[in-house]
Amino acid sequence: MFCIQCEQTIQTPAVKGCSFAQGMCGKTSEVSDLQDVLVYTLQGVSFWASKALEFNIINDEINQWAPKAFFSTLTNVNFDPERILELTSQAANYKALLKEQVMSAATLSNTNLADIPAVANFELPNSAEAILAFAPQVAVNRGKDQVHEDVIGLRLLCLYGLKGAAAYMEHARVLEQTNNDIYAEYHEIMAWLGTDPEDLGELLDCSMRIGLMNYKVMEMLDQGETTTFGHPEPTTVNVKPVKGKCILVSGHDLHDLEKILQQTEGKGINVYTNGEMLPAHGYPELKKYPHLVGNYGSAWQNQQKEFANFPGAIVMTSNCLLNPNVGQYADRLFTRSIVGWPGVAHIEGDDFSQVIECALAQDGFQHDEIEHHITVGFSRNALMNAAPAVIDQVKQGNIKHFFLVGGCDGDKAERSYYTDFTAEAPEDTLILTLACGKFRFNKNTFGDINGIPRLLDVGQCNDAYSAIQLALALAKEFDCDINELPLTLVLSWFEQKAIVILLTLFALGVKGIYTGPTAPAFLTPNLIAIIQEKFDMRSIGNVQDDLKAILAA
């Protein structure tokens, strides 16, 4: 086992990366090794998909399936070795199909297929034991003894960034947003990474290419969400329980939430969001359901306690999943799509009757708690509608600075920085937030600036697209570069979606971003220095010192 993709991976003077019987996330060495083989097989699929395109062969099924399968290897998504093996077997079948089609087309056109890499010709062993024995040969840090550690670091930056983009591609696909040009670019990059490139300049360029590709993917996802569910509107959300039977929906998939709301109408079941599903309350086509009663719980790392105390059924639509046996709620948990845990019920298709039956069999909440409301729904359209008023307050000198404080949450005590930062930000500053990092402070009171709330919840992690649109609008209004705006991004990272959003911001030319709580373990000190110099990236430090430096600039 070797896994170094998330923020909580082992980092000591002697060891970097999880390389023992179990990773810090809870996945076993078996699952980790199987995921490595799946990724390698997917790189072979991408080689033949790219080669097929040269012969005008496009397989929509494979194009849409491949990023989804890659998504299954993202942190805290799938811990089930049987499911990973099934995906790997399917990948091998797709690879063989594409290879056969390309070979036939090449023969018919009298084309010589030269320079076929090992990743394209590799044959998947025919048993789980043989696959596991083969896994060390395709570990994500393969070749580490032959190349400089900076090469491995940049390969991983690209691989993990592309994995984050693949996750957003799958979220978009669920909402019927697909794009063959983006799939072609994905396959080209994935296949190239499978050849173990060594040129640092090319790898850096590739990371920027991934960032720009992801910007287009986030635009697709924004289009899918707003076309399907309407543009989010500022909406108050109760974060306390309501008496009655209940279902909790966690993850990111708004499609699943809608299906659950439709199928629970009139059944006396209250539906709650959790974690990154909180922004769902702002969408007109979702908030119209009166039994979508509120949000329960906070960020992913608290789920083992919060889910254990939730007296109903729980649906995990995407990341982040933790071991449900710790809180003894595995019998009330249902996974969807690429999510998996051994022994936990998995739902294929859109029939949630099992979830409903489970919810009706549970006690539910026995009484109402005193309501506590927070506000969500400040996504792209709402932000753009508010832009004239915001610009006016800036011109009057009432808004001096903008902060975007958000990203992934996690366990580390250092993450209290983000709570303290928002608390100490001057009252003439506006704070935008997104992703689950918001749970560090989104129940606190921030007041307003002449009617404009000081805390604006932009949405899920992918709604960084909305924040970018506001920044571009402000830059246009003030006739300046985006880096000349009184705007500072203060981001927290945990997994690969955060990595690709950072690459997107870098690729768009955004500089001076503060990141934390720690640097990615897969980046060497030399690579961190290069990124800091090239993009003026800064590590978070002391809140007071950071605020002083930001506001003095």
Swiss-Prot record:
Disulfide bonds: none
Catalyzed reaction equations: A + NH4(+) + H2O = hydroxylamine + AH2 + H(+)
Organism: Vibrio parahaemolyticus serotype O3:K6 (strain RIMD 2210633)
Main location: cytoplasm
Cofactor requirement: [2Fe-2S] cluster; hybrid [4Fe-2O-2S] cluster
Gene Ontology MF: a single term: hydroxylamine reductase activity
Binding site for [2Fe-2S] cluster: 3, 6, 18, 25
Protein known as: Hydroxylamine reductase
Compartmental location: Cytoplasm
Entry annotated with the keyword Iron-sulfur: yes
Enzyme class: oxidoreductase
Family of the protein in this entry: Belongs to the HCP family.
GO biological process annotation, one example: response to hydrogen peroxide
Domain of life: Bacteria
EC number: 1.7.99.1
Cysteine persulfide sites (modified residues): 408
Keywords of the record: 2Fe-2S, Cytoplasm, Iron, Iron-sulfur, Metal-binding, Oxidoreductase
Cofactor stoichiometry and binding remark: Binds 1 [2Fe-2S] cluster.
Gene3D superfamilies for the chain: 1.20.1270.20, 3.40.50.2030
Cellular component GO terms held in the UniProt record: cytoplasm
Function noted in UniProt: Catalyzes the reduction of hydroxylamine to form NH(3) and H(2)O.
Binding site for hybrid [4Fe-2O-2S] cluster: 252, 276, 320, 408, 436, 461, 495, 497
